[in-house]
Design a protein with these regions (language model features):
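Non-catalytic, polymerase-adjacent accessory regions of viral genome-replication enzymes
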Residues: 1-42, 352, 358, 366-386
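Glycine-/proline-rich flexible loop or hinge segments
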Residues: 18-29, 59-70, 94-97
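Reverse-transcriptase-like RNA-dependent polymerase core
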Residues: 42-64, 158-172
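Conserved pre-motif C helix in the palm subdomain of viral-like polymerases
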Residues: 65-95, 178-205
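Right-hand nucleic-acid polymerase module
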Residues: 77, 81, 173, 177-178, ...
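Active-site-proximal segment of RNA-dependent polymerases
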Residues: 79-129, 133-139
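Conserved polymerase palm-domain catalytic core
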Residues: 113-215, 219-237, 253, 323
Length: 386
């Protein structure tokens, strides 16, 4: 088998990559197809350090803390992306089918469908695991051991070791040398995330009746003794690998008890949008409502015209929700989103956030062409079964 870096250096491979992923990014395509890129690959194979210190930026607060994201320069980012792509293509076979994060042909939709269709799921206990700041706690030394035993390309192993040992970053103009082995923002990080618990995946497949992992979001089902054994084993693994539980998101649940997993709520075989997801939609719609009210005042638009514009905008984004229809199998969450949208249109029409907005009745919304997401959901389901 050719070296992975030999494949990346190949003109046809790079050309196919650019045509598939970089059609609207001429600058990156030019670099990937250039002689400079070929020289960078040569330097990597010679063990030279060509990755420059990324810039650390803090994102918005999440749970009272800032999230650290490392931003690499454009050329380094482009180089790391194509290497990550090649790694995922070549070494996807080493991962269990129960792992579905950052992998081609694996999705939340597939997992939820499997869970919802599992015979006896309503009688099973569930153990859900979440790691706190997963990337930040991955041990470079432990990951190196895993890489050595799973990757058969010496140049790739050498390069990945170099990445894990590279701790430099820049924050507020000053250079530091105490960064984590795995940096959020590095295109290789998803591969590292998947690889770090690869042995855990293999073991949990044997211990639980149902087991799935998305990076550090883990869910499994079985009998109560099975889940207790899985919880005990997970604690051992986390202690050994230096990982920390997110205690608020790690628990054993009774049969049919609601479990929040990613953006969903699972209650046995029932799958719905989570409260957090619906609240995120509420915040987004509220911001957009303020934008439409501002435009209405600025241009002196009529109530009806403003509502029509808002409706047109909302319905143009229905495709986002329709993509999620195959995942959920109840309309409770969809109905809540419908009410959020209806209230937003009423607010846009009346310029009132109070109960005064309800002078616009549902019949008026229908006359303007409003269609509920619930009706779109059932149309989708019926079309699927025709």
């Amino acid at each position: 088998m050719n070296s992975l870096f030999s494949d990346i250096s190949n003109f046809e491979y790079r050309n196919e990559y650019c045509n598939k992923y970089l059609l609207n990014d001429a600058e990156t395509s030019e670099y990937i197809m250039s002689h400079e890129f070929e020289k960078d690959i040569e330097f990597i194979c010679l063990g030279k350090q060509i990755i420059e210190a990324p810039i650390l930026k803090l994102s918005n607060k999440v749970g009272g803390r800032y999230r650290k994201i490392y931003h690499f320069n454009v050329q380094n980012l482009s180089l790391l992306k194509i290497i990550a792509h090649a790694l995922n293509e070549r070494y996807d076979y080493i991962f269990s089918d129960n792992l579905y994060s950052y992998r081609k042909n694996f999705s939340v939709k597939k997992v939820c469908k499997r869970i919802g269709n599992t015979k006896g799921i309503d009688d099973m206990y569930c153990y859900k695991v979440d790691a706190s700041s997963y990337d930040q706690h991955i041990s470079g030394d432990i990951l190196k051991t895993i890489i050595s035993s799973t990757i058969d390309d010496k140049n790739v192993v050498k390069f990945l070791f170099q990445i894990l040992d590279f701790k430099k970053y820049i924050y507020e103009g000053r250079e530091y040398n105490d960064g984590p082995a795995v940096m959020t923002g590095n295109p290789l990080t998803p591969f590292f995330d998947n690889l770090y618990l690869i042995d855990y995946d293999d073991e949990m497949r044997k211990k639980a009746k149902i087991y799935y992992r998305y990076s550090d979001d883990i869910i499994m089902y079985g009998t109560l003794p099975q889940m207790q054994e899985c919880a005990s084993y997970t604690k051992e693994v986390f202690n050994k690998k230096g990982l920390i539980f997110n205690e608020t998101k790690t628990n054993i649940y009774k049969p049919k008890e609601t479990v929040r997993y990613l953006s969903l709520e699972l209650s046995g075989s029932k799958i719905d949008f989570s409260k957090q997801y619906i609240n995120n939609i509420r915040r987004l719609v509220k911001r957009k409502t303020h934008s439409f009210l501002k435009i209405k005042r600025q241009y002196g638009l009529s109530d009806e015209l403003t509502m029509k514009c808002a409706l047109k905008f909302i319905e143009s984004n229905y495709g986002f929700f329709i993509k999620l229809f195959p995942i959920v199998n109840t309309t409770n969450g969809i109905a809540k989103i419908d009410r959020i949208i209806q209230d937003a249109i009423r607010t846009v029409g009346t310029s009132k956030f109070s109960n005064g907005r309800y002078r616009i009745k549902y019949g008026q919304l229908k006359k303007l062409g409003y269609k509920t997401l619930v009706s779109e959901y059932y149309s989708f389901k019926w079309a699927k079964h025709e």
